[in-house]
Regions:
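Interhelical loop and helix-boundary elements at the membrane-water interface
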Residues: 2-135
């Protein structure tokens, strides 16, 4: 019989497993980053940068690729995980390579776009690069 503690633990593991492509994407953007900024160094009418130097094309592309690869790995591992732990998993996970690639791409690219939008919004309210946004 499965108790509530086991359900909670497996739910946490499943959530972390699902969000892993976004985490890998964010970390990889730092590794692959640098180069031309996503905003092409454009400024608004007040002379402020649109996004800043911290969000680059190499980071966007590298992060998205790595998130997609993580999703592909999860797609390959999905059937094995379900076979061995299916009774504990209450959230659907990708069960083949194509699903893994699609989910990995969407989560990885979504994380990169989310970072760029966050940087854009921070610049609009005058928060500098590397400074936390008050939430």
């Amino acid at each position: 019989m499965v108790d509530n503690t086991q359900i909670f633990i497996m739910a946490c593991i499943t959530i972390l497993y699902f969000i892993l492509p976004a985490y890998v994407s964010n970390g990889s953007a730092l590794v692959f980053g640098g180069g031309l900024p996503l905003d092409f160094k454009k400024t608004d009418k007040n002379g402020n940068r649109w996004i800043g130097n911290g969000v680059t094309w190499r980071g966007l592309i590298g992060g998205t690729i790595m998130g997609t690869l993580m999703g592909a790995i999860q797609g390959l591992l999905g059937p094995i995980i379900l076979e061995n732990f299916g009774e504990f998993i209450y959230t659907p996970i990708c069960t083949n390579l194509v699903e893994g690639i699609i989910i990995g791409f969407l989560l990885g690219f979504g994380a990169m776009v989310g970072d760029a939008v966050g940087s854009f919004l921070k610049r609009r309210v005058g928060i500098g690069q590397g400074k936390p946004a008050p939430i």
